[in-house]
Amino acid sequence: MGFRKILASKSHHSRHHNQHHKNLKLQNHRYVLISNITGSHETKYLSPFRMDNCSGSRRRDRLHVKLKSLRNKIHKQLHPNCRFDDATKTSDDKCVSYEVPERDGLATISLEEVFPKSNRCQIPEENLGETDSVIHRDLGNFANENDYPQWRKVESQYNLENVQPEEDEIVDRLRSEIRSTKLKSVKTTSRTLEKAIEARCTGKRVLQQLSCQSNQLTKIESNCDMLKIQSNVADRKIDELAHENRSLLALKSPNPFRKKREREKRDQIYNLKLKHRHLQQETMKRAQDSDKNLAINLSSEYGRYGQGVERQRILRDAQKYQFEADEEDNQMEIDLYGNLEQIKAVSGDLKIMAHAFGREFEAQNTRMFDIENNVQQADNALQAKRYRLEKVIGKRW
């Protein structure tokens, strides 16, 4: 049987009012008694929560704390299937527990093993009447050390001397936690490295697609340049056709004053060739710039770490993160360092590719805008030449 907090007042201090104790409210009473029922009568011990500074109260408080620690040791360490009986019982009269349901399969540890009858401190008979008005404040002094509760017998019976966790257990637990944390870190960095390498491969594919797209734009620009040149040639051919299609009555003798006009025509043809060459150079320059944007320096291979001098340096730097390091722990540190270094290298490659993407996107957007303008101008010129050619062919004399 165990200690039980019972409210004490002028009319409620006896063990014969258990049912009425259930209905009392704790917040309406200031003083609390902890009761233990002996063989023939009730023995009361003051609660450690009382507002008293006497030496007897402090001694009882220490006993209460030590007893509570002993109960927890028995319950948690050695007897997980045992519990203290919260009922207030005597050898003459058996009382039910205070709203504590019985649990099957659990043994009950009696506090008689801790407090034998011969060592229980009883309330002096001359002070029994004080409990009718106030809480009894002094339950007598212990005569000697043998009057203290005999929990030494219980410690020896339940072997509680060495229930504290051993230093080796603490070390093993710390080593296990460190090892599990490092394993998680290695796995996490490995997964991160895999995702980074996948992103790097995707970036390479995008670079290849941009390179193919740049080649297509180069071909389109070359065709636009040829369209401009052929448009100028068409103008010259239409002029010749108009000259040959002149009236029959027109003079056909050579004009000695046309040398200047012929010279201008030759200059026009020469300028047309220069323009063609200039357009081709611009097209090639754009293609080269595109290739230069896409020709980035990436880390083709990532070295293996943990060999020779590099291994010693890694292990020397990792000593502050290790606890009783062994070969497995050293290997985890090397793997972790290698994963982080590779992630760093791949991240640098991704950054370089991102900048290359930005430059190439801007360049290709500019090229496509120029292609659109050139095609629009060539279409307008083609419509004008068609109208002029129809006018020359349909001319009547």
From Swiss-Prot:
Its keywords, alphabetically, are: Cell membrane, Coiled coil, Membrane, Sporulation
Changing residue 71 to E: what effect?
Answer: Strong decrease of the sporulation rate and loss of lipid binding
Q: Where is this region: Disordered?
A: 1-26
Q: Where is this region: Inhibitory region?
A: 4-50
Annotated effect of mutating residue 66 to E: Strong decrease of the sporulation rate and loss of lipid binding
Where is it localised? Answer: Cell membrane; Prospore membrane
Subunit-structure text: Interacts with the t-SNARE SSO1 and the v-SNARE SNC2.
Q: What is this protein called in UniProt?
A: Sporulation-specific protein 20
Supply the source organism for this entry: Saccharomyces cerevisiae (strain ATCC 204508 / S288c) (Baker's yeast)
